[in-house]
Amino acid sequence: MRNKLNEVKEFDIISRCDTIRIAMFDDPYPYIVPVNFGEEIIGDQVVFYIHTSYGGKKNDLLAKNPNIAFEMDCNHELYYRESNMSCNFRYESVVGTGRVEIVPEEEKEKALTLLMNHYHPESVKFNPKFVYMTQCMKIVVNDMTAKRAMPKKDTPDYKVMQFQGEVRSPHM
């Protein structure tokens, strides 16, 4: 059963995420890629902007079927509670679906500016040569859900567990 307390309606989580993962249709398995992004909210419509080179598997798959699923997450922290001898993981995440559209040439600079603003608020100028060589896409969001598992840190037995080097499976 899903924990209703973890569902979140506000999407401020997006501003804290640094990568969006896009899942596309491929046969026989989905194809997923992590990309950086910018966002814009127009009325009730959420739009994500990404950039890519021209050509490649991602572009080929999106040309066949522009419908995608996406995921982003942030604020990861492994913690331990001595009182009940349990570990858990703090996180915030957003998942959803959307449709990818190519950004027209005359709107590419706006898309790249929104992308840069997600990571750095200062204005930057773009070299027209590189803007021309960059393909921009927008993801028009159909639906999206946010979740948060952020237990309070104010209990005396709450201990953050530091990751030790690489995170890897003991089976590898």
Locate the predicted segments by residue.
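Charged, gly/pro-rich active-site loop segments
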Residues: 2, 77-172
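Short N-terminal helix-initiation segments at or just after the protein's N-terminus
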Residues: 10-14, 32-47, 76-88
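Histidine-centered metal-chelating micro-motifs
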Residues: 55-60, 78
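A generic structural signal for nonpolar/aromatic side chains embedded in well-ordered alpha-helices
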Residues: 13-14, 61-62, 115
